[in-house]
Every structure is written in C-alpha cells, then in structure tokens.
Amino acid sequence: MKQERIRNGRCNRVARLEKPDGLSEARDFSHEFFTMSSFDTANVTNMNKMWYNCRSLTRLDLSNFDTSGVTGMDCAFYACHGMNTLVLGEKFAFVGNTYSIPLSRWKNSKGEVFDSDGTVSNIPDNAADVYSKL
C-alpha cells in the first residue's frame, strides 16, 4: 500500500493490508501502530465512515473520544464484522441512526446486555465501559 493513499484520506483498504512495503529497515514500531488514545476529537464534526469496511478490526478503544461536536456518524462502523470489543468513554455518544454497529448482542462489564440490529444499538451514550460481542 502506498503512503499517498493514506495521506489522501483513502485508507479504507488498510484493514486488508497483507504485505506492507518498505519495512526492512524499521527497528522501532512503538509509535507506528494505529492507536487512538491521543486523538483530540473535541472539534471533530464528521465521523461518517470513519472505520468503514475495517473487517479485520477486532478491538476499538474510543475511551478518549469526545463526540459532543459530531453531527455525522453515518456508517462509521459499517462492515466491521471482526470487531469483538468496543471501549467507550464518558464523552462518547453515538450520533444519528445509521452508525452501523455490527449486528450482535453486546455485554458490558456489569453483565448488562445490549442489542444491535446492524444499524443502531441500545448501547448507552456517555457511559464509560467495555462492551464485548456475545
């Protein structure tokens, strides 16, 4: 995969990357892996298709995300069929009615079960917790 594709915002195939190029000289990967713990989302308004088609994504930690300014989250999690764990923080709220949480039942750390029909879910907003797919 070429870096230009990522820089131009067209990285919907990153989840299917099979053979990265140019890593033969790499020695320190400590800051290279995709982590969102330091993302500042306080001024973000559009999260449409943010993780769209990330089929290999198994765990998503959004505990530091502030979605209070977000007005669009359409298809944000569409086709994330491999996602088994979703970590949400007290400032995370789902927006709209087409954010596409994978079809399943989800259990939080208290044992409460929430449903997703593949489009929306009844996972509560602004409730910090870890949700696991059943």
What are these regions (language model features)?
Residues 70-134:
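Leucine-rich solenoid repeat scaffolds
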